[in-house]
Amino acid sequence: MDIKRSILLVALAVVSYLLVLQWNQDYGQAALPPQNAVAQSASPALPETVPGDSSTSADVPTAGSGNQVPDSAASTAGSDLIQVRTDVLEVAIDPRGGDIVQLKLPKFPRRQDHPEIPFQLFDNGSERLYLAQSGLTGTNGPDARADGRPLYVSEQRSYQLADGQDSLVVDLKFSDGGVDYVKRFTFKRGAYDLEVRHQIANHSEQPWSGNLFAQLKRDASADPSSTTATGTATYLGAALWTSEEPYRKVSMGDMDDKNLRETVQGGWVAWLQHYFVTAWVPNKDDTNLVATRKDSQGNYIIGFTGSTLNIPAGATGETVTRLYAGPKDQNQLEALSPGLELTVDYGFLWFIAQPIFWLLELIHALLGNWGWSIIVLTVIIKLAFFPLSAASYRSMGRMRAVAPKLQALKEQHGEDRQKLSQAMMELYKKEKINPLGGCLPILVQMPVFLALYWVLLESVEMRQAPWLGWITDLSVKDPYFILPIIMGATMFFQQTLNPTPPDPMQARVMKLMPIIFTFFFLWFPAGLVLYWVVNNVLSIGQQWYITRQIEKAAQLA
């Protein structure tokens, strides 16, 4: 049993190390230098064709294509941007095209020590490009004009959601060739999603034809929301929904290799980063062409183009889509579109992680502190595994009782490993000891441990969440390494309650385990280390109690 337990503990240490490596490999995206030294154009870069009737399909803007819409010379100056402020969003809209070029989240400080500075999700400056674009392209779409994207006008340069007001409407207007266009943004209180509605009034004598497009455009700069201690980054890249795959990642590397083009009904396209997500969500009944590409300036684009909209002369029409830009709030994401909540990526153990987060959220609603919630969650998990743990500790207690007999067998058989193993198995059988009895709890609890790891890593609720004292952020490492050291000490003390392996090499390996684990856990989120510390303390108490019961029973026998 000691050999098996040693192997399992070594495997656990290796898994801990692989978690860091896998974090970097699957969720890391190396930051590349900014592609441009000046603010870049907000001109769209879209698929070359759109779904729909082939007779009405038309080219859509594609950067670098000679017969398409040319890039605008530059983005609108900051002073001319249309500013919109709600209780949860601070948005800047470029009148040229009506793109959202800046977006801040006042409820989420950029840094914990500067709560007055909001985290900025969208930016169109010299250091970083990330924006949401939408418009009308196709045969008569204003975004496909030869002289550039439309320059909208609005009644105000600044809008603010007033106290007691539940929604805020911002209209941008443009007229061309007898056709009036209104691009209407509707913001709601407490919501990170907004409606973007394009209204077309065809006053000309000719039929109008066009297509809605919406896309997310980003350069390869680093994720400003990633604050991991090891210098690695969580997943930074695109994702989309299809009927075959409700959640599919499309990394920057994938876009480097090839362009993606798929026709879907409804669905969504998104850009993911640590704790935050941006997504365009078209009408669920519309047929859309989803596409990804890398433009000539090195920017990465994911978006969709809708079916052709035909409006007869003298008639009106409209098309609607929604934009989500904010935290990975599972409740809001799930309500917005099926599968969008999966952007809170808990990995392959999501079916364990989701109930853990649900329970953790329930506890937090009662306690109001995520650190204490983790402690209570640990107690609940420990109680759930109590029967397995008790069986394991009873097995260890019996092993401790027969340790002198095992040592005698070793001295008797010397270096004859085969006879020693045979004699040990006979002893186990005689004493009714399962040599693997101590392994099962470790194996069963590993998925829970890994699932909790992803919950703490992915859940925006943990971002900048304090516990007490020096732990001001449970999502990053302990700044003074106090919890990892306590964890190592509890592991060392717990080993004193276990039977000493008869093999000297195994004994040395076991003594090294607390040191190895302490080293790995130095860089893990403080919330995860807190879970492990509490789990160890509870295990020590449980093991001590059961071991004493076994010893008393042996004395009475």
Curated annotation (Swiss-Prot):
* Keywords noted in UniProt: Cell inner membrane, Cell membrane, Chaperone, Membrane, Protein transport, Transmembrane, Transmembrane helix, Transport
Q: Where is this region: Disordered?
A: 42-77
Gene Ontology CC annotation, any one: plasma membrane
| Chain ranges passing through the membrane | 7-27, 370-390, 436-456, 514-534
Q: What GO MF terms are annotated?
A: membrane insertase activity
For this protein, the record's Gene3D superfamilies field holds: 2.70.98.90
**Bias category Polar residues: which stretches?**
52-77
Q: Which family does the similarity line name?
A: Belongs to the OXA1/ALB3/YidC family. Type 1 subfamily.
**PANTHER family recorded:** CYTOCHROME C OXIDASE ASSEMBLY PROTEIN COX18, MITOCHONDRIAL, OXA1
State the oligomer form and interacting partners. Answer: Interacts with the Sec translocase complex via SecD. Specifically interacts with transmembrane segments of nascent integral membrane proteins during membrane integration.
HAMAP family listed in its UniProt record: YidC_type1
Official protein name in the record: Membrane protein insertase YidC
The species is Azotobacter vinelandii (strain DJ / ATCC BAA-1303)
